[in-house]
Amino acid sequence: MILDPQQIPDREKLILAGLFLSKFDKVGLGLLGFDTFTEAFNVIGIALGGKPSSIKNYRDEFDPLFPNPRAGWHHRSPRPYCAAVLEEYGDLDIQTFCALIKSFVGYEAKASTQPPKSRDEKESAYARRLLTGLAAERYFESVQPGLSIFKSCAVENTTRLGCGYDFRLRRKAEGEFLAVEVKGLMEMTGGISLTQKEHEVAEALSFRFFLFVVKNFRETPCHEIYRDPLAGPLVFEKKKRIVVQVSWQASA
């Protein structure tokens, strides 16, 4: 059994997500922070670079094998490659399986750089926030070539560079770049937060900074683009949060 996400093929990750949702049903759904299967299909499918319908189809394929209320594809046995995944991973307990699904989208790495917003934020809500953020980034990558405002741009993913935006776009190798910060919302409306770094960069770059908001993961994702968001229709209010850090010291 392979538990290293780097060694698991992309299609197998989609199959495993479907298997997890079929086997653990609404309990598993809740552990990932989702309220409905549709939002889980949308977020996980897009985050893994696949289609939401693929996750649903794999879940339905496994449904007849587990005691959940859905009939699934009861008229036939799982396809050989799905049966092979079931044979290898079907006995995983819910916590181990959930951790595996989270690892597909770099949960541990993101958790180390994007701490919970507050002590009260539950792990499931935290997981959903990170999953939704990655899904929004993948959504942007998929639609960017067809957006006239970013047409013919070379795109660099800067999410791991800590530079205050997620993507750097250039039309010419030596020309000025455009910065795109991507945010994701479950609903059509919701709160959007900028970190201190993101706000500073947005202010400095002005019209070269874009806020790309992916909305409605709960049903059908769509997007809205805000150029120079600090000067546009959005009103940002500064919030301060005090973090208490505890350490233990000893003299040697």
PLM region spans:
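Short, charged amphipathic recognition helices of the HTH superfamily
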Residues: L3, K26-G45
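Eukaryotic helical DNA- and histone-tail-recognition domains of regulatory proteins
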Residues: I8-F34
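Major-groove recognition helix of helix-turn-helix-like DNA-binding domains
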Residues: L48-F66
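Interdomain/boundary linker segments immediately adjacent to catalytic/signaling cores
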Residues: H74-L130
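Acidic-basic catalytic patches of nuclease active cores, encompassing PD-(D/E)XK
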Residues: D120-C153
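Conserved catalytic cores of phosphodiester-cleaving nucleases, focusing on short active-site segments
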Residues: F140, Q144, Y165-L169, L178-M186
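A short acidic/basic microdomain associated with nuclease active sites
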Residues: P145-R170
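Catalytic cores of nucleic-acid endonucleases
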Residues: V182-A231
